[in-house]
Every structure is written in C-alpha cells, then in structure tokens.
A protein has these predicted regions:
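A glycine-rich helix N-cap at a beta->alpha junction
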Residues: 207-223
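Conserved hydrophobic/aromatic beta-strand scaffold that supports enzyme active sites
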Residues: 109-111, 147-149, 217-219
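Short linear sequence motif anchored by a di-proline
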Residues: 18-21, 202-205
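Solvent-exposed coil/turn segments that connect beta secondary-structure elements
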Residues: 72, 100-102, 114-115, 151-155, ...
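Bacterial N-terminal signal peptides
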Residues: 4-16
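Small-aliphatic-rich amphipathic alpha-helix that forms the alpha element of a beta-alpha
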Residues: 48, 67, 95, 146-157, ...
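N-terminal amphipathic, basic helical "cap/leader" segment at the start of enzyme domains
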Residues: 20-144
Length: 223
C-alpha cells in the first residue's frame, strides 16, 4: 500500500482513541448542596481540629457533595464565581477524589467539575493504598473513607500575573482547604490536611497531567 495511504490510516487509528476515551468517562451528578446547616461558622471554627483516626463507617454521597461545594462550588451562577476566592478568577485548582467507602459511589478515582457540580469517573478501584505509600505511609490516608486531593495548574494564573501567580495559587489552595475542613466540622466529620508526601509518587498514583502539581491530601471520615 502506498505510504500516502498508510499514514492517514495510522493517524485515523490513533487520534479517535483519545476522543473516545474522553467521551467514555462516566459523569455522576452530585446531590444539590444545602445553603444552611445546624452549626454556626463560629462554632465550626472553634471546633475544628486535625483528626487522624476514623471509624470504619462510610460517607454519604450528599456529604461528599457538600465538601466539594465548599471547596470550589459555584456560588454566583451567572458570573461563575466560586466558594473560594481566585486571583483574576483564573481557577487554577483541580479537585480529585480517591473514594474508598462512600455510599452510592463505587470505589475509584474521580474529578470534580464545578460547572454542573458533578464527578467524572477517571478510574475504578481503591487508590488510598497508593496515596498512603506516597504520603510516607501515614495511616490516616489509608483509613479515611475518602481523600480529597487538591492539585494546581500554576500556568493558568501565572499567564496573567507572572511569578506572583505562584503565591496567588498557593493562597487559593489554602482558602479551599480551610473551606473543606470547616465544612467537614459542620457535617460532624473529621479531616486533616496532609502536606508530607512525595509529589511525583502522588502524580504517578493518580496519573495526573504533567502540568498539575499536588498541593494537599485531605483525608475525611467519621471520628
């Protein structure tokens, strides 16, 4: 067969694969987040502690939904503004979920989509053990029914603010992580922020894109 026929054919076999892989990803709608709770903000701030021991009890899907809404939920629909401030509304953060024990959600790796407030299933299986190894074998990472991973694509903010954008991204990650921790308290859940991990090991375990860097692991469960 002539080369000019072979080349387009080989490209046709390769290119649709990525498109089909993306199209095949399962989208899971999350329950609508509530805008009022039984605990005041002041009480949540006063009660928050780092919790590293969790009972063997699953989370509910509506609880995970609420936690992710607190992290980066859209709070102003028309403009798309979110629960945590972002420099120039550049939104450099991505939120991944290593789910091990969540009712109505199979174990797997998921990514939160703020638009539409839904999860994209990236892979099936329990990723907590791999994260546990990457996080210097901290037991809370393995024992928590769910681990939220905050990753950052720094270039989204640096494209607008240059080197100063690095600081803005790190600030935003802190805002989001604190929102998650306070929301966990409001739900009578325990959480702890983990920064002691090998970045490359986390990236490999979750197959993160090359331009994304993990900043936080947040194990969450019932104390």
């Amino acid at each position: 067969m002539p080369l000019w026929l072979i080349l387009p054919l080989s490209l046709a076999l390769i290119l649709p694969l990525g498109e089909n892989a993306t199209a095949a990803l399962k989208e899971i709608p999350l329950p609508e987040p509530r805008l009022s709770g039984s605990m005041s903000l002041e009480e949540a701030i006063a009660t928050r502690r780092s919790v590293r021991s969790f009972r063997k009890a699953p989370l509910e899907l509506h609880e995970l939904s609420q936690l992710l809404w607190a992290a980066q939920g859209i709070t102003q629909g028309q403009a798309g503004f979110r629960a945590a401030p972002s420099a120039g509304a550049t939104y450099p953060l991505e939120f991944y979920i290593a789910a091990g024990s969540v009712n109505d959600l199979p174990p797997g790796l998921y990514k939160h989509k703020a638009q539409g407030h839904e999860l994209t299933e990236l892979a099936k299986g329990d990723f907590r053990s791999a994260l546990h190894d990457a996080a210097l074998r901290q037991r809370c990472v393995k024992d928590a029914p769910v681990v939220i991973i905050i990753a950052a694509a720094y270039e989204r903010t640096m494209a607008r603010y240059g080197e100063r954008g690095i600081r803005y991204v790190n600030m935003e990650a802190g805002h989001s992580a604190q929102n998650v921790c306070l929301q966990a308290v409001s739900l009578r859940l325990g959480s702890v922020v983990v920064g002691a991990f090998n970045d490359e090991s986390v990236k490999r375990a979750l197959s993160l894109p090359q331009n994304e860097n993990p900043l936080y692991l947040i194990p969450i469960g019932r104390p």
